[in-house]
Amino acid sequence: KWALGIALVAVAGFTSCSDQPDAYETTGGTPSISYIRLADAASKDSLLTGAFQNTPICIVGNNLRSIVAMNFNDRPATLNTSYMTDNTILLTVPKDIPDVVTDKIYMITTSNDTVTYDFKVLINPPSVLSMENEQAKAGEEGVIKGNYFLDYPDFPLTVEFPNNYVLPREYIKSITMTEIRFTVPEDAPAGFIKVKTKYGTTRSNFQFHDQRGILFDFDTPNPVTNVVLGNHGWHAQKIQEDETSLSGKYLLLGDVDMTADGAWNDGNFSFEYWAGDWNGGFSGDGVKLSDIVDFTDFENMSLKFEMCIPENGAWAAAPMQIIFAGPDKVTISTANNVFFHADDGWGRAIYAPWKDSGSYNTGGKWVTVTLALGGDQGVFNKYWDGTAASVKPSKPEDFASLTIFCVNAGGYIGEDCHPIIKIDNIRAVPNK
């Protein structure tokens, strides 16, 4: 019986082999490529001489089952024999950036020969997304963030400021795929920054040392009424200058204990600029912010400011509610603390960088915070309790006044802390 069982297994094994006449087998000889197209059959007439990383392609040729490995430049492609025939190979262009660019495909055969075919792996031009501190001073470290920051010995990456000022190479401290660290030079002009690589040049959407759309820098008279704007509400938060200043005076919120539930403490955590004067107008230090900055295209604008939080003043509770409002909601003469949590569900941004990590500080450095006012990335869409807002700012005059209040009304429970939050250069600027 045992012998019969073994014999039956052996027969079954041979039967299973003979039942797979289409099993993949490699061939000998030399492969050749006739052309390459997109893998999508609907695009079969689109012949390619190059493709971006991670693009599905179809290689058409002869004797392609003689290929056992394939490299694009110096990066291997994944070959799936289920998608390989004598005449076609379906594969995806490798996603990794090549170290050595030759603009060739290398086909390694069953006989360990290498056959080449001219084909470019197209690499995206650099993406320049943000600067850690747009107001970084000369001698300080600047950090540009983005992607595809590719630096080659034969084509070094360059950073260009306005007026054709190219950052000297010796000022660049390090380059990774997503970050450029450099020492800010004394004579770098303010404005848009360009990053150039072998694969293209991209201009930033932000400006270095941006002075557009300033609402509060706590030092400079506004251009409409020639008055320095600051506290203009119920509370007089500290506006001060010291050795930690970014540039002149800054606004200080906190520097007192805050409970984990983010309890109401407007005396220490609420900055109010409520437009208006006591005569029913908007003169002097009560000018409407919407008269200082043009908010007509607010859907394509962002609120920005620089913020500094020391390690010994980490922020771990009470999200920052940033609330714009029109004269119909609040002025200095109609001052109230109801408009921003009334039943109409008025929208605002709720900023809580500590929420996921449990605690947040900037290590005593100044960093730029960017909050989109509108559009797909707009964040001024939350109500007082963190739910979706029913009504959002919809016209320029809705940006006449500004309240910044660190307080929790639901969903933002943190940890007991003693936050020290320094803010400067509050501005509203175009996204591009």
Tell what function each PLM region has.
Residues 237-284:
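Short carbohydrate-recognition loop motifs
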Residues 335-392:
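Extracellular carbohydrate recognition and processing domains
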Residues 312-336:
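Beta-strand acidic-aromatic groove motif in beta-rich domains, primarily in extracellular
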Residues 421-428:
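Extracellular beta-strand elements of beta-rich domains used
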Residues 304-305, 319-321, 368-420:
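Extracellular beta-strand ligand-recognition surfaces/modules
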